[in-house]
A protein has these predicted regions:
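The feature captures the beta-strand-to-loop junction immediately N-terminal to the Walker
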Residues: 38-40
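Conserved ABC transporter NBD signature motif
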Residues: 61-69, 78
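Conserved catalytic motifs of ABC-family nucleotide-binding domains
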Residues: 160
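Catalytic Walker B motif of ABC-type/P-loop ATPase nucleotide-binding domains
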Residues: 164-168
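ABC ATPase nucleotide-binding domains
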Residues: 241-322, 339-352, 364-370
């Protein structure tokens, strides 16, 4: 059964002071779905999020929350449906973690902000869910960035929203806290069926955590679809105008620009034995060639990105004589051979012959292991 739609935009244009920056934005968010905005710095991701969160006025078009026009929702009514965590840091003085989390109950408390037993139970439940209960008596300002971000997530959950909007929630976090935070977010969307709309700079994480990706650049949405649809055919390189390297769609990581020129080193690799060496050679400014690899080999994406020349066979095909002759010709023009492989089988037997050919020719050979 298809999940209920929580939010959608219709012909939305956003900007500042009446000037349109991004036009005709059409996106939707369903229960239990994570939708992520990506794009270059200054593309307008935060502007879109702030407009959807009613912090900026729409220039044209509309935002609908469960088919109710955003303009018709009162502040407290919206706060019961939508919570936000933006990049601007809050600096509450002399407030404990529990105090900050409890601020999320403001849509439900009176003017004095007095918590009822139910409110206190929700605060405790949210701290437990985000695993910050042991910190509840700590001063918020004494926490690490990762801990603060978890507290702000718990505060947002205290509103008991259906929609959660996050602007670059992992920007200040190290890799451990990034993974922990996004894992919590993913678990929360599954269990509570909350819809999450956020922006991320980390493309590898966006690819892994998102159900849909919205690509923001220029005056329009450049692309909108599943990660499998967006992270394909070199689109990310085009979106970010990458020239000093390339985004590897299969791995979700980036490789720096290859060293040009005539290959000085020939690398015999495969089965993941060569990728670290390829990067080491690139760092040292040494142009190199690689062979023979299958195009399905784990080393192939890095080789294709960093090597001047790659002699490769089609995926799942045996290496043939033509591959051997092409590799031999390139290898013999190099000053050195580096062999990363220690095990040779039936498929890569021609790589063993290449190594033997290098020995017979008296070439300098280095056996390399990570």
């Amino acid at each position: 059964m298809e999940e209920r739609e929580l939010l959608h935009t219709d012909g939305l244009s956003v900007g500042y002071h009446g000037k349109e920056l991004i036009k005709e934005i059409g996106i939707s968010l369903k229960m239990g779905e994570i939708v992520t905005l990506i794009g270059p710095n200054g593309a307008g991701k935060s502007t879109i999020l702030k407009t959807i969160a009613k912090q900026l006025q729409e220039i044209r078009g509309s935002v609908y929350v469960e088919n109710i026009n955003l303009s018709e929702l009162p502040e407290k009514g919206l706060a019961k449906k939508m919570s936000i965590v933006f990049t601007e840091r809050i600096t509450p003085e002399l407030m404990t973690v529990a105090d900050v989390v409890a601020m999320g109950r403001y849509p439900y408390t009176g003017g004095l902000g007095i918590l009822t037993p139910k409110d206190e139970a929700v605060v405790a439940q949210c701290m437990e869910q985000i695993r910050i209960s042991p910190l509840k008596e700590r001063n918020f300002m004494s926490l690490s960035d990762g801990q603060k971000q978890r507290v702000l997530l718990a505060k947002a959950l205290c509103q008991e929203p259906e929609i959660l909007i996050l602007d670059e929630p992992t920007s200040y976090l190290d890799v451990k806290y990034k993974l922990e935070f996004l894992s919590m977010l993913q678990e929360m969307t599954r269990k509570k069926k909350i819809g999450v709309l956020m922006s991320l700079h980390e493309l590898d994480l966006a690819e892994r955590v998102s159900d849909k990706i919205v690509c923001v650049k220029g005056e329009n949405i450049e692309n909108y679809g599943t990660p499998e649809e967006v992270f394909a055919d070199g689109f990310v390189d085009q979106l970010y105008e990458i020239t000093d390297g390339t985004f590897q769609e299969k791995s979700g990581c980036v490789e720096l620009k290859k060293c040009g020129g005539i290959p000085e080193v020939f690398v015999i690799a495969g089965n993941g034995t060569g990728s670290f060496l390829f990067r080491q050679l690139q760092r040292n400014g040494i142009p190199f060639a690689v062979g023979i690899l299958g195009k399905n080999d784990i080393d192939y994406p890095a080789a294709e990105a960093l090597a001047v020349q790659v002699i490769a066979a089609e995926a799942y095909q045996d290496f043939e004589g033509e591959h051997y002759e092409a590799a031999k010709q390139v290898m013999c023009a190099c000053r050195k051979v580096i062999c990363c492989q220690t095990v040779f089988g039936s498929q890569n037997r021609l790589n063993r012959q290449l190594l033997q050919e290098a020995e017979d020719c008296g070439m300098e050979i280095e056996l390399w292991q990570k």
